[in-house]
Amino acid sequence: MDNKTDNKNNLTPQSAPSSAPHKERLTPMMEQYIEIKAVNSDCLLFYRMGDFYELFFNDAIEAAQVLGITLTTRGKHLGEDIPMCGVPVHTADDYLQKLISCGYRVAVCEQTEDPAEAKKRGSKSIVRRDVVRLVTPGTLTEEKLLDPTRANYLMTLARIKTSDGEEFALSWIDISTGIFRVTESRLEKLLADIMRVDPQEIIVADSFFHDKSHKSLFNVLDCIVSPQHASLFDVITAERDICSYFKLSTLEGIADYSRPELSAIAAAIRYIEKTQITHRPPLMRPERQNESATLFIDAATRLSLELVRTTSGQRDGSLLKAIDRTVTGGGSRLLLDRLIAPLTTPSAIDKRLDSIAFFLRNTSLAEDIKLILKGGPDMPRAVSRLALGRGGPRDMASIQRGFEIIRELHQLLSNELLPQEISDVQQIFSHLPTALHLRLEQALADDLPLLKRDGGFIRPHYHKELDEMRTLRDESRRVIAELQAQYAQETDIKTLKIKHNNILGYFIEVTNLQATALTNTPQAKARFIHRQTMANAMRFTTTELAELESRIAHAANHALTLELEIFDTLVHEITEQVDFIRKAAESLAVLDVSVALAHLAEEQGYCRPKIDQSLTFCITAGRHPVVEQALRKQAAEPFVANNCDLSLQENHQYAAIWLLTGPNMGGKSTFLRQNALIAIMAQMGSFVPATSAHIGVVDRLFSRVGASDDLARGRSTFMMEMVETATILNHATQHSLVILDEIGRGTSTFDGLSIAWATVEYLHEVNHCRAILATHFHEMTALTEKLDRLHNVTMKVKNWDGDVIFLHEVTPGAADRSYGVQVAKLAGLPKAVITRATDVLQQLEQGEMAGKGHKLIDDLPLFSLKTTSSLNEDTNKYSMLHEAFKNIHPDELSPKQALEALYHLKQLEKNNPL
């Protein structure tokens, strides 16, 4: 993954002019532009000019290239043309989307007064303009700019330096829904925590970003990283700023946030205020995420298991795509949220499973709910847009439609004996603000415009004065038509038209030849007042037409003013109910996910897993959820189900480890992955692809399946493999599940075998975790003779006339060969190569390689299998020596003191031999 550093973070200021242009000989408008640009030099400036946003200088060059629009010029500066491009205001979202996706920040500069007000300040005064918003990847709210199926998180990453080292915290916000969460982290799990949230933009202090010791972290992030001044993370004023935002007198009783958490929360709030400028989005209070409440999945494991996206970045082929049957945007986001953070508390998992079981028993009810939910509105995002002043009549209609869905579902569920999770949903639905629901139904028209400025969104008969203004406006337009007919008859000009434009208002238009009929007598000249001569037409007005125009303009303007006042009143009432709207929307998502997972379980034949706190891991007839569905779509052979039992066995204190051998293409990697995916699905609260499943809660899941280089950090495939294996060995516990595929294959045979051998021993004797390890080192199968919890299993194959048939069945036992030559034959290698490879293989198998595994067992006692306590003793001894060395300052010692220090170290080593 390549991190996309914010193009506009002053590190690579591609959009800002290399040097600010001088103001000399510039128009007042261009002077204003340069002043505003100077304050927002790290952004592309969208400068409002009538119906366009215009960009100038380097901004224009950059934007024109990215957007594929015409680059032109306007005016000159220092003898050179000023580059300029522009985009229409009504399609600006489309262009913003492209710029944001390319890593740009955009400052939106609007006209804050109309030209008439500017003229009152003087004939040469220009319209006031101000930046009203900074658009960044993590602060989007517009429907066009957002993916309805995923959250749009802005993350702040805080670091606090202490005498003991560094402390970290993360906070993440989706301003489009109001979600606000925070958690503490550690350096070794920062990447995993960031990848779990999957933010669109990360805010860090510039000092942290430029710290060379953390460079590798930022190099691998696949999102925009925006370094900011360290003051954004100031922890001294953090509590004050947080209380100010949420209108609290104190944080006591809310949460006992740590200093890093306070820094991260405050930074998020300050950045939101910095980018939103004129509005404060209604955010939820920061919810602390407990590290132990969710299954820890490290970054490498998330990638290798392809939970949300495949390794090539596609959604198709991922676990999420395979299990998603939701019908709403909120449901899709909740399903994703559950998938990336499975639970570790059996009772909480069972609440979710109870909901699925309920809908499996009540399929008709589930179908009714699905029909009601299908295509339902995204209420949290609609209410956020309304609160931020970016919403329109259709967002208001989304709230009204959402209320209607809640009312229908509340009635539908009222006669059912509900499981706890659905009962909680029903309880929230019971608090529907019926008065507001009724008011929205009565107020909103059936056919709504996109923008409130277009008017016509309030239903007739809702507001008496508005109806009167509309009648006057519409009646006046009818009078215009009658007046046109009257003038045509009086002048005997059948083609006479009364037209309108924004410059002249209403006017009479005739051809140049016909104009003489309006000017040939003094009476006609007095009545028909000349306004404009065109190439082929002349334009006139009359006193009565001017008076009528004034009445129409007043009525139309007043009608729109009244509509906007009603809109603002309704927005205020809606935002007063923001807490209910968010809880209700979350409840709708819970219903959607529960019904969707019930549908998935019925469609795919999944079973309810048994989840407890034991060390059990027993899967009967497990299948890979993604591969199984792919085979069905291809009408291929059905997926071969396999059992997996790593459970605690009689007379053993810890769970089992399986050592899996077998041929290439035999299905080893699929078997490894499917068991990891089954564990994730079970703990996210889903039924699983098996006939039965009993899983003791997994606290940490580690998977090293597949291999790739990390060229950005100068790491080879083998180095990456060793780094990931080190993470597993250093952090796996007895409640963890470890999946390892072909450890040691990236180096020489003997090196690889040695590392794999020692790794299995360590997992067995130190980590005590549940594990499945696949290997081609058949010598390792002999380890089962001395490791009592290690069991050999193999992928079953059949030989038929010299060809190998893969049965994809896992059975007890060990493979004696890998069938690599047979696989090469299937791949189409030349016959001569296959023949030669077969000869070489036979010679090797008959030579000194034979029987190596048992010889190793005989020659190598289990010397490395130290107990955890003995390992801790070694660590303590090293710590004592390290502490002694740390307290020695050679430049400050006299010769006598140096000698005494040396004797002291010698005595320490003697008393604590390693």
Curated annotation (Swiss-Prot):
GO molecular function, one term: mismatched DNA binding
Keyword Transit peptide assigned: no
Region entry Disordered, spans: 1-24
GO BP annotations listed: mismatch repair
CDD domains listed in its UniProt record: ABC_MutS1
Keywords: ATP-binding, DNA damage, DNA repair, DNA-binding, Nucleotide-binding
Binding residue positions for ATP: 662-669
Keyword Nucleus: no
Gene Ontology CC annotations of this record: cytosol
Pfam families linked: MutS_I (PF01624), MutS_II (PF05188), MutS_III (PF05192), MutS_IV (PF05190), MutS_V (PF00488)
Record-linked InterPro entries: DNA_mismatch_repair_MutS, DNA_mismatch_repair_MutS-lik_N, DNA_mismatch_repair_MutS/MSH, DNA_mismatch_repair_MutS_C, DNA_mismatch_repair_MutS_clamp, DNA_mismatch_repair_MutS_core, DNA_mismatch_repair_MutS_N, DNA_mismatch_repair_MutS_sf
Compositionally biased tracts (Polar residues): 8-18
Family membership: Belongs to the DNA mismatch repair MutS family.
Xref: NCBIfam families: mutS1, PRK05399.1
Family matches, as PANTHER family: DNA MISMATCH REPAIR PROTEIN MSH1, MITOCHONDRIAL (PTHR11361:SF34), DNA MISMATCH REPAIR PROTEIN MUTS FAMILY MEMBER (PTHR11361)
Function: This protein is involved in the repair of mismatches in DNA. It is possible that it carries out the mismatch recognition step. This protein has a weak ATPase activity.
UniProt-recorded name of the protein: DNA mismatch repair protein MutS
Organism this protein belongs to: Bartonella henselae (strain ATCC 49882 / DSM 28221 / CCUG 30454 / Houston 1) (Rochalimaea henselae)
Annotated gene: mutS
